[in-house]
Amino acid sequence: MASTANDRQQLPNGDASTERIQIIDENKTFTPDLTQQIERWGLRDSGFNYNLVAVFGSQSTGKSTLLNRLFGTTFDVMDETRRQQTTKGIWMCRGKDMSVMVMDVEGTDGRERGEDQDFERKSALFSLASSEVLIVNMWEHQVGLYQGANMGLLKTVFEVNLGLFGKKANDGTSGRTLLLFVIRDHIGTTPLANLQATLIQDLNRIWDSLSKPDDLKDRLLSDYFDMAFTTLPHKVLVPDKFEAEVANLRKRFTDKDNEGYLFKPVYHKRIPADGVAFYMENIWEQVQNNKDLDLPTQQELLAQFRCDEISAAALAEFNEQAKPQKRPIEAGRVVENLGNMMRNWRTQALTRYDREASRYHKGVYTRKRTDLIAVIDSTLSPLFLGQLKNLHKSCLVTFKKEILEGLKGDEYDFGTVVQKARTKCEKTFSEGAKEAVVEEGAAGWSWEEEMELLMEEVGAVADQCRKDETKKMINLIERNVKKLISEPVELHLTKPSTDMWDKVMKTFKDTLDKAESTYLAKAKSFNCTEEENTNALASLKRRAWIVLRAKIEEQTSDQSLLGKLRGHFEERFRYDEEGVPRVWKPDDDIDGAFKKAKEETLELVPLYSRIKPTDSSLEFELPSDGSSDDLTNDEFDFASSLTVLSDTKSLDLINKFRKDADAYYVEAKRSTVSSIAQIPYWMYGVLVVLGWNEAMAVLFNPLYFTFLLFALASAYMIIQLGLTGPLLQVTRAVASEVQKQATNKLREVVGQGQAEAVALQPMRAQRQNETEYENANGDDLRQR
């Protein structure tokens, strides 16, 4: 029964392993379904663990029957009663319980194609290029014949496509093909050895007759082909022997320990099972177009095609794994175990590629693997660099936080805090960076440069923190200096003397020396340079001087200094040398005392006007080197700061003091006048004489005397109990309340009178109008 209607046929039992497929139809078209069919056979993932065998020979010689018996295939067989062509084109089927793909090639010398031998030549060449073992099926009586034994076809194939075999390895150890001649209906009259010798002789004759290139003239057929020969009894006449010999022949295909095992590794075309369809299709295309068949090139093309497919599949899976991690990296987050994940993705992709692609052409496989690694790394590299940047930012933030936390306490060593934070930052970054490296030592996976950038920024942050802490420390020392010099300076300026500025400057220098010692002691842990210490000390001196100058300004303001001058003047004018207050008498020398006290006081104004200690060692000078402290450096003139009172201010102060001193002088003069104008003593005698009767009346009147005693006793008790003040306050409060109540009553009375006046005003106006009206009427009557 012909099988040309369908490309794929399945037996009724539905077993996919028994399906057969027409890979090339009678119109010389290659099927696109071979890859799918190989997968249905379960051979797609076999790699090199499969074999491929083909059969060709004359039409109706039982090729399909032989294959079905040998391999358990399901090819259609000829209807012996009709003797017509059964196999058209090339069919393929899997051997039963065998990893063998079997090709059944259309028979040659058939009446259906007649003189058209093009397909015969192309199918034979296709079979030679694809199969490990090529079974040449012939009858015993065809041995020695040229056409019947297909010698003419083999010669044509060898002659036209000599390049196919010439490009194989010169040592003949690779790319070899086994030609298995199966001689059917062997009677036994002619021994197999004789038949074998005849066939070998014919094949060598064909090979020798070929026109070969100069570099292949000495090559023999055995350099490229191995040949094996076997016979089978008549299938119809001796069926039992036929089946027995077929079974023996089958063992040569299945039993690797068999001495005559046919599927030797040297015959394998090294085409992985998943690439067989593509390889065969390209071979057929080359054969169909009558192009020189270059098997190595075809193998490379197949390798490129399959390696690209495998690489694309591995890359697609890799991209699906890597995609979810892009967003957190772009968002600036550090992804935990990113390096381990990337290495796993990369390893999985390469493992998948290696598992399937390593079976193909070594050069292509290696080249495509390199390309795949480059693509994978180009995807992983942004993740790696992003992870480094995020680690950089995270470590820098942590470093700043660690420093700030370490500087919160009262007692801390700045250098230790910075070093501890720096070590932790460096360790965290290096551990994270090393973990993120996909391939250690490979180009594009270095993180040392990013580490250097991080350390530079860490150094900059540490320097800034050191500067801030230095300023903070200087500010603290400045406040301490201000606190320490405030009271002593105020005391020295309040009690002026010729060595006043010596005392002030000594106090200032002692305090400044302590401040500098405090700074240097703390600055050791800051790892400050000599230049930084010099600038800091210069800034500290300026700040301390400004603090001192501010205190002096406070104590020498107009009111404060005028008060000091008045106090100094009063001590010398109002008090004697022993500090006893003076009560001026008319005969005292007020003018002399006033002049002396005034002159001594005015001598203080030049003393206050300029900071100038008598001891030259106590003179203070600011360093002339520049400082970056803007707070103390803005237009600061040290020379002018030594002047406390300008000439104008001194003159104004002197004038104000003279006015105050003159007031004290006038007051002193008035006190002497008041002592002169006191009541004469004789007036007291007059008062006693004139008031004696009234005094006696009070003393001898019981009522008045009792009231007097009560008043005196009450006054005594109030004074003894200290109730004088509270009593006066109560008296004032009562008087104030009485006054308030009286005022309110008076306002009410006045307000009521005004209201009555307003109410009576309309009535008065009406009466006035009536009076005027009556007067007018009276005048009219008198006129009449």
From Swiss-Prot:
It comes from the Eukaryota. Residues 1-678, 724-784 are cytoplasmic. The gene is SEY1. InterPro entries: G_GB1_RHD3_dom, P-loop_NTPase, RHD3/Sey1, Sey1/RHD3-like_3HB. Cooperates with the reticulon proteins and tubule-shaping DP1 family proteins to generate and maintain the structure of the tubular endoplasmic reticulum network. Has GTPase activity, which is required for its function in ER organization. Signal peptide: none annotated. GO terms for cellular component: endoplasmic reticulum membrane. This is Protein SEY1. It is found in: Endoplasmic reticulum membrane. One of its GO terms (biological process) is endoplasmic reticulum membrane fusion. It is a multi-pass membrane protein. The keyword Transmembrane applies. It is an enzyme of class 3 (hydrolase). Keywords: Coiled coil, Endoplasmic reticulum, GTP-binding, Hydrolase, Membrane, Nucleotide-binding, Transmembrane, Transmembrane helix. GTP binds at residues 57-64. The chain crosses the membrane at residues 679-699, 703-723. Gene3D superfamilies: P-loop containing nucleotide triphosphate hydrolases.
